[in-house]
Design a protein with these regions (language model features):
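N-terminal signal peptide c-region/cleavage motif recognized by signal peptidases
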Residues: 16-18
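Pocket-lining segment of extracytoplasmic ligand-binding domains
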Residues: 84, 94-95, 123, 159-239
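Bacterial N-terminal signal peptides that target proteins for export
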Residues: 1-8
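A structural signal for short loop-to-beta-strand junctions that line the ligand-binding cleft
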Residues: 98-110, 238-239
Length: 239
């Protein structure tokens, strides 16, 4: 699979937890969307816990980086997948969080994830400056990838409402639905904060063919500075 190496934003995937289950207790995990890497990994983690800890039953349901912090804090789950900067914002009530969520704790740091932005190989879109009237699919509300997108286009001087006013569409849907929209030509851009490589992008590379959108150094320098927790990264050409 050919990929252009370009500047991207990455963050560490980690698990956050509230109180851990005791014996004869049900342990609930909120992970990621179907089609992403978090959901199958979350299912495996829960399987291992259930077989290794006597008296514990488990479940794994889909979620998003922002909503998972809220679910754990609110007692709807005991363990949730998120990103380092997302849970830090949630704990302190910053960013997309309207209040502080103090009933969360770090449980484990797993691996870095990249915010990836792809267009069809024949697209005229060369950068974020060309997306002001595009049909984009950045993820669902309360997903960290959606927040990534908003922070980037904010630096370019527009937002989701601007896109809509200009005749574009913001599809807030799942990875699976985003892939279908890209294949049908109903979405011009697919964005996701996920592992590298990732199944949805591999599927789109096979058909209809895609290329990735990066950020110029001066732009990414400013975005990283303005968003604590963001770090630099590149998609390897061999990925």
């Amino acid at each position: 699979m050919k990929r252009i190496s370009g500047a991207i934003l990455i963050a560490s995937s980690l698990l956050v937890t509230s109180s851990i289950a005791n014996a004869d207790q049900f342990l609930r995990m909120v992970s990621g969307p179907s089609g992403g890497s978090w959901y199958p990994l979350g299912a495996k983690v829960m399987q291992v816990m259930e077989t290794s800890i006597k008296g514990v039953s488990t479940s794994n349901t889909s979620g998003g980086g922002i909503s998972n912090v809220m679910s754990v804090d609110g007692g709807d789950a005991e363990i949730g997948w998120t990103y380092a900067h997302t849970v830090a914002n949630g704990y302190s009530g910053k960013g997309k969080f309207k209040k502080a969520h103090k009933n969360v704790r770090y449980f484990a740091t797993l691996y870095p994830a990249a915010f990836q932005v792809a267009v069809r190989a024949d697209s005229k879109i060369k950068g974020f400056e060309d997306m002001k009237s595009a049909n984009i699919s950045p993820g669902k509300p309360k997903w960290t990838g959606t927040a990534f997108c908003e922070s980037i286009i904010k630096d370019y001087g527009y937002d989701f409402n601007t896109i809509k006013k200009n005749g574009g569409v913001v599809h807030m849907v799942s990875y699976k639905e985003s892939v279908a929209l890209m294949k049908d030509g109903q979405a011009d851009v697919f964005m996701a904060a996920t592992s590298v490589p990732q199944a949805s992008f591999i599927e789109l590379e096979n058909s209809p063919g895609i290329r990735f959108i990066g950020l110029p150094k001066d732009r990414i320098d400013r975005i990283v500075k303005n968003n604590p927790g963001y770090i630099y990264g590149k998609i390897p050409a061999s990925a």
